[in-house]
Amino acid sequence: GEGALVMIDNFVNDPAYKALLDKVNIVIVPRINPDGSYLFSRATYDGFDMNRDHMSLKAAELAQLHTAYRLFMSEVVLDTHEFTFYGAYNDDWTSAGEYMENADDLETTPATSLNNNPAVTKIGLDMAKRAFSDATNAGLRVNHYGTTVNNPIGRAYFGLFNAVSFLIETRGIGAGRQTFERRVFSQEVAATSYITYAAEHADEIMKAVAAARADVVAKGKTYEESDVLALYQTKSGKTLTDYTAATVQYSVADGSEKVSKASPLSLNDTLTRSRVRPTAYVIPADTANIEKILYIMDNQGAEYYKLNAGTTASLQQYYYVGDYMVNGKAKGIEAGLRDTADVTFASGAYVFPMDQVASNVIAMLCEPDVTDSNGYDGTLYQYKQIDYDKSTMNFPLYRYTGNDPRTTLVSNGTSAEPTQPTQPEKPSQPASSDTYTVVSGDSLWKIASKQLGNGSRWTEIYDLNKDTVKSPSVIFV
C-alpha cells in the first residue's frame, strides 16, 4: 500500500512522472485488503487469501476489483505484494544454520502461461528485463519470483485477459517497520520501471494487446483442432529468459556475503495436458449452485445467454475418468468427453460462448481438470460448484464445437422465454413500464447480463438512467 501511495505522490508532484501521463493512463488501487492489513494478516477478515481467489471469487473485494478492472481493461497490470523472510538455513536447506535464505529486495516476473498470446508474453519478458536492470542500477538486489500458471493467482489471472501482467514482490511480511524505506523504495523502482517502459512503448503494447484480444474472440467463433487450451504446463528446461539473477545471502554470524551463480528463469514451455478449445460451454439451468456459478461468471465479465426449456442441442458431455497421477501421487483429476449426442434441457440451459475477451477465464473455470490450478479452487469443479454423478460419472457440463454458437446454438424448445441476446445497431428505448428493482450486490454489468443478456450493454442502462444513477460504479438500493 505504501509503495502505491508513493507512486500517487510522484504523479501529482514530480514533473518527470507527470510527463508520463501524456502517454499512459494509470489506475491505482492502493490496497484491496484493508481489514487483513489492519490485523497484520495475509487473509481477509473472513479468512480468504485473495491472491489465490481470482477464479472462484470467495472474497467480495475481488469481485469488486474485477468490476473495476473491466471498466478500463488496462493493457498492463502490476500486482504488488510482499514476501516473507523465512529464516536462516545450512547449505543442505534442511535445518537452521548460518546463512539467511535470501536477501532479495525485489522479486518480479511476468505472466507467461501458454494460454496467453506469445507476442504479449514477449513484451512482458522484455519489460521484466528492463526492470531487472533498473533495480540493479538503483542498488537493489533483484531476483526472479519463479513462474506461475496457477490461474487463481493475480499475475496469471490478468494474463488470461492478455494483459501484460506482472507480480512485484518486496521483502516485508513479518518485518514490521524494519528497513521500511528500502522496502517502499523497491516497490517504487519496480513500478516506475514498468510504467516508464509502457509509456515509451505505448503504441506497441496497445496494438499487441488489442490484437491478442481480437484473436481470442475470433478463435472462439470457429472450432479448430489445432487450437488447444493448456491444462497442465511443465518446463523442459530449454526455454529460458535472456536475463539472469543471482541469489544473495548473508551470514547471521558475521555478516559475510554469499552470492550464487547468476541464472536465467526456466519458463513453462510444454503442454503436458491440453484439450481443444470449444466454441461454447453449456451448463443446465437446473444445476445445483447455478446462482453461485452465474455470480462468478458475472464478476468475471462473462457474456452468456439462456436456452429455453425443452431445447435440444448436439453436445459433448464431460465425465470423470479418475485421479490424475504425477510421479505416483494424485494431482487433481482427469476428465473425458462423451461422444457428441443430442441433449434436451428440460429446464433450459446457460450458454457461455467463447467468442469473447473473457473466453480464457471461462475455459479455465469450466474445464473440470485444469491441473495447473489444482488445490486452489481454480475451476467450478475444484471449487465444488459442480460435481460428477457417482453412478454415471457425468458432470452437468457440456461443450459445443459448432461454429458461431450465438447463431447456431439457440433455443428450439416450446418455452416463451427469449432465446438469446440481440445486438441492435442502436440501443432500444424501453417502454416506461420496463422497470427493474435493484437489490443489494447489483451492478450495472450484472443487471445488463440479466435483463439484456449481455453485461457489456451496461452503458445502455446507464445512459437511460443518468438522472437516478449518478455514478456507473455506485447504485443506491
Please place each PLM-identified region on the residue numbering.
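Structured catalytic-domain cores with a bias toward divalent-metal coordination
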Residues: G1-P430
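Soluble periplasmic/extracytoplasmic beta-strand elements of cell-envelope proteins
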Residues: V27, T435-V439, K446, E460-D463, ...
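Glycine-centered loop/turn positions within well-structured domains
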Residues: D35, W445, D467
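Glycine-rich, flexible loop/turn motifs
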Residues: T44-D46, M50, A448, N465, ...
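Primarily a LysM-type cell-wall glycan-binding module
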Residues: E425-G455
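Extracellular LysM carbohydrate-binding repeats and other cell-envelope/extracellular binding modules
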Residues: N454-V477
